[in-house]
Amino acid sequence: MTAKEEEKQERFQLLMTQIGLQDVTTYEEFTKDAKIEKLVADKKNKTWQFHLHVPQIFPAALFHMMDVGMKRAFSQIAETEMQIVPENQTIDETLIQDYWNLIVEPIGKQSPMIGKLLMEQKPTFKEPHFIEVAVHNDMEEATIQQRFQTKIIESYGKAGFPRLAMKMHLLDQSETEEYKAFALAKQEEDQKKAAEAVQVMQKRQAEGQSGGGGAAPLTGPFQIGYKIKDDEEVKRLGDIYDEERRITVQGLIFATEIRELRSGRSLLQFKITDYTSSMIIKMFSRDNEDAAMFQNLKKGMWVKVRGSVQNDTFVRDLIMMAQDVNEIAGVKRLDTAEEKRAELHLHSPMSQMDATSSVDSLFKQAADWGHKAIAITDHSVAQSFPEAYGAGQKYGLKVIFGIEANLIDDGVPIAYNDQHIALEDATYCVFDVETTGLSAVYDTIIELAGVKMKNGEIIDKFEAFIDPGHPLSATTINLTGITDDMVKGSDPIDVVLKRFKEWSGDDILVAHNASFDMGFINTAYEKVGLEKAENAVVDTLELARFLYPHFKNHRLNTLTKKFNIILEQHHRAVFDAEATAYLAWKLIKDAKEMHNIDFHDSLNDYMGEGDAYKRARPFHATIYAQTAVGLKNLFKLITMSNINYFYRVPRIPRSQLKKLREGLIIGTACSQGELFEAMMQKGMQAAEKVAEFYDFIEVQPKPVYAPLIERELVRDEKALEEILKNIVRVGEKTGKPVVATGNVHYKDPVDKIYRKILIHSQGGANPLNRAELPDVHFRTTDEMLKEFAFLGEEKAKEIVVTNANLVVDWMEDLKPIKDELYTPKIDGAEDEVRNMSYAMAHQLYGEKLPEIVEARLEKELKSIIGHGFAVIYLISHKLVKKSLVDGYLVGSRGSVGSSFVATMTEITEVNPLPPHYLCPNCKDSEFFDDGSVGSGFDLPDKDCPHCGTPYQKEGQDIPFETFLGFKGDKVPDIDLNFSGDYQPVAHAYTKEIFGEDYVFRAGTIGTVAEKTAFGYVRNYERDMNMTIRGAEIDRLVAGCTGVKRTTGQHPGGIIVIPDYMDVYDFTPVQFPADATDSEWKTTHFDFHSIHDNVLKLDILGHDDPTAIRMLQDLSGIDPKTIPTDDPDVMKLFGSTESLGVKPADIDSKTGTLGIPEFGTRFVRQMLEQTKPTTFSELVQISGLSHGTDVWLGNAEELIKNKTCELPDVIGCRDDIMVFLIYQGLESSLAFKIMESVRKGKGLTEEMEEAMMANKVPLWYIESCKKIKYMFPKAHAAAYVLMAVRIAYFKVHYPLYFYATYFTVRADDFDLTSMVNGKEAVKATMKEVNDKGMEASTKEKNLLTVLEIANEMLARGFHFQKVDLYKSSADEFIIDGDSLIPPFNAIPSLGTNVAKQIVAARENGEFLSKEDLQQRGKVSKTIIQYMDDQGCLEGLPDQNQLSLF
């Protein structure tokens, strides 16, 4: 070795010393001959690049240590980087993957989404030198290619790797509703299996058995590593702020995950919380025993963990690397009382944005504590009743079904103590009081002022301060402006009141919110020994609400400002009284003018009429169903409150509650109930009067009322106790049981934070944000007894235990949902369906039906009629028939095309019989029932041998069992795709068929999603100036998800109530999202809750029928006559030949852009690989593209490996049953195998054995095992039929196709690019593509439209500008070889304005741009856009008047 070479080696060793790695002996084989070849220093940019000559590529850990060490050592001098030059560039997949996180981690700072995508996977390595990663969609692929691919490859290059190439493959997942329903069912099934597995494991443990393989059964508490001593110091998670060497923590596990690493080891990752914070715990398995033990660590366990806390670069947060994990006993609240209470006031997550614990968790808690019953009382809704009933059955609890209603009085009086006094001639004593609080019982008047008014003029004044005998609170001083100095030494209350009573005499008393002021005056009169005022009274607040209901609010300062009345200092009695006087005179005159009210005793004549319910202030009451009649009445009240009396919240007028009181029990509810308010503000006598209306009285623990003290509505805890004691006395006096309830909003005290976050998210709109939230967790009997100890032990037990159970015993056991299906009845439906089916069959197949036809008809009709489904077929027939008569085709969804009766009754176009020829003339037929033909549409053209007429070709070979099950008893789910334009008509037609009172939109409940909850948590963190660890955020997010946020309606679901029942037998009714102007009412229950009880029609809106209708209108071609095997159309699915363009022209090797089901990049890739040429192969493609694990890693590999061809692979679920029957399997077993495979359950040993015995290929069996979800063939066939028809127009009538596509399917346009031609369009497409994942949704939608526009331009057609006199409002118009865009294609110009322009145009030419703006209702921005595009050439700016 030369001296120079030795020097280079010495420099390298010196470098290692400088960066602190001189003693790293582990990697000696990589570093001992390493040299610094050169150092490139860039003084200007302050960068140093070390070129290191090494024997072989460094391990990733060594490279990382050196990189970090160099950056740290030279940070004050320059930025550093390495360029490794290895002698041996040998690489493998392990090395590639070891470097992966180092290389892609920085990407997360530039694009968190792409960073996360890449960090969560490992690339695969393919020879010679390329790596492959997975992406979900085209935009992710484009973003990586354009922004990050080069950086990744260069980073590997700097580490010494040979030049790599990078490849991406697309993942796919069906987004259909059917898939979502399947996924939900699968999840529930998995959870059930998991629960069963736990039971089995526990049983084995009890019996001392051991299962083979999998998780090692626990024989005691879970433990990995050493035992952690009981007395070892435990650190709170909330006290950990930095890395720590070796500490112990403990907490509840709320998430677990086990990852299998490529090294063969397992990584256990779980999250724990001790409710001060949360943390991620990681642990690597040391051996197979550890890996097996990991399986036993479950969510819900409490554990103690010892390990080191460190910063994890992957999650960018502190985590703990665990050495020891011990299961410990959890923290549990126990109910140790011998006699248990029952909770009668409890909220579930259906109390909108207000309660967080699931029904299941609350009911389980009640059962664990030994309670025998529990009530549900959500705010105004019964939406948790179905779940509560199920939970009650599960845990053996009696469920009391109730609501916490918003009760209102029927109209609030404007006048009190009615007297026949002429209003214009009267003298008014207008007064105002300022007080120390809101309670006339516990607070005092500190200022009393009044003015006398006659004929609108003030004729006298009264003003006095009153000494309360104690210092004023800060709140009182701030609100009123009255200070201690102002009241100190003033006259006492009795003196002032006596003077005021004499001064006011018999005049009409007037106050703004008179119930408050009169309450204080009369209570004060009584206290000092004076009689209550008998004067006539006018309340200006209620009079203003009556006269001006449209005002946003009716506060005194708002009204005085509105009517230009001077209010010098609000909340000072003297100024308020004077302003109120002038306001009162204005209102009296308006009452005369607007309603001809002349006398005081006429002011209440309109009370309760019209919108009076909006003016009433709601108070809470709990309403329970005692009997079945009561349950139905409760449903009626909920409906009424949502439909007839909704204003901000659903309201129930007292009169309506009285009418429907049979079978109901009514409680007084919480602090917002009228009894508590009466006791707090008016005293014992008023409270006793209120109590008469109720069946029992509620009191709640003092902490539940804490906000009243904080807001100074109640003076202190002692005053609160006094109120509660008095309420108990009211119960004793009136004979009404007093029951202690918890107003429960969550299960445990630690759950309070979730509610805080939800309430905080609503800001000032929620009054609960005005004070600290109370503690409203589910309390044990012991906790409740302790809360009411101030009443004495005996009385506390009476209200907590005895009376609660007394009320429970009043209630009958009720079931809020039905057990059976109740379908509507149509007389003669069975005969009509049978007759229609046979009539159509004879019309098509002749008088003597082929045996295969008659057998199929009889088989289906037996099931359909026998199980009462004929009416469902008849209804669907009527809907489809009306649409067809009105000129719109209907596409079928789901498996309805599996039913030949559905075909014969014109519900679906799909014919499920085996492929066959059919003569339209002599009715001859020829069937192929041996599986040799996939679809009748694929049969070669042939003439009838009997009469020479060309045969029709039919039959898709789909078994009936896939629709109604093997026994034919499954409720038919007939989903129909109507034109989006026609869907409202189809919906309205159901009202004609059944009557408006029997059809409702299927209701849905929108809950807080994880993403939304994340936003709530982050905003809470920001507003509270907190820093919350990532794992804690995850816990808080989980605690906030699933809470009801709004309601809605299924896009196409119509619920039909049979006319021999009414809707209240099943559900209450409401408007979607509380939109009282909605055309449709919805079921109050989520439709899934009553899916098995009533008929649901799926009348969906779809673009395909709309497109077909427009194409028919343009061409005059009946779509039913379009051939399904046109050669040029079939070429479209494998090449661009039929379009007359090259693949490079349109950036696609197929011609299917814009063809439904076949236009996405994912499906186009499938077409390129499979090259389908027949209808049945297109059906295969449709099935493969919608399934899960049917194409990727399954059929794709089979075709690629030439194991089989496209027609042979499993595409749709029905293929399995048909193929297995053809192979010789018994039909019921074939059906079971199909059902098992389509649900992702795989095959049992017995199934496999039967398949192998019948010579089913091994590859077919293995393919079945991989499948997670499958598409029905009937659905695929219906979609493909529509697609082929549309493709026919694309090939043979291109401008009709493009005009239709842009009119029906496109929403976003770039007219400038489209009008300027192909290069402009391509340039805009490139701009969007260059943005990758950063492109907005609008830009992504535009890209799809531009792809079609580019194709149209490539075929030699072009776009014109929007034409002021030719353009349509909302349709593209064909003009020669071009399209004229409609007005609504202009950015920000809506369809209504577009129609206005056309309407104005029909009334005469536009004289100027000004004329267009005025008559067309067009904004200046739109005028400018149209002018810039040259659409307004020759049009002057303004109208010009010529004199000559």
From Swiss-Prot:
Where does the record say this protein resides? Cytoplasm
Q: Which domain of life is it from?
A: Bacteria
Q: Which UniProt keywords apply?
A: Cytoplasm, DNA replication, DNA-directed DNA polymerase, Exonuclease, Hydrolase, Nuclease, Nucleotidyltransferase, Transferase
Q: Which reaction does it catalyse?
A: DNA(n) + a 2'-deoxyribonucleoside 5'-triphosphate = DNA(n+1) + diphosphate
What's the chief localization of this chain?
Answer: cytoplasm
Q: Which residues form the Exonuclease domain?
A: 428-584
Function, in words: Required for replicative DNA synthesis. This DNA polymerase also exhibits 3' to 5' exonuclease activity.
Specify the protein name.
DNA polymerase III PolC-type
Source organism per entry reads Listeria monocytogenes serotype 4b (strain F2365)
